[in-house]
């Protein structure tokens, strides 16, 4: 679980090993776009996949020996991608549930960034399985990190710290 100071509050989250690395191991960007268009996000794929890139998970389940589940692989690549996207969405839903179990207030909506934000089928699958509205924001790579860095420098300056002379910003 990670906590980041943002403005006057905290942004809490969890870092799973699951993510787009698995998708990139299996499909090119062009294939992801083409296959995604073939997915009906309102229907279940019927697959129960756990798309980890390697053995081990850290959130929402802390288990260094947790095995990826990438089979059965159907003949249809579109159906396989559908199942992988659902698997990622289920892991995300478990993460939100785990955060609430630990005392985080329930989320009202999610804001998604990056490449996945441009995939309407995946966004809808996530909405269906997580149960929250998801708003897409398409921003350049690393824009979020750049904003956090800018906020940290502004905070340091406001507190009288010289960012160039400090190895650690508040």
Annotated model-derived regions:
Residues 1-110, 118-141, 146-169:
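Active-site core segments that coordinate phosphate-bearing ligands/cofactors
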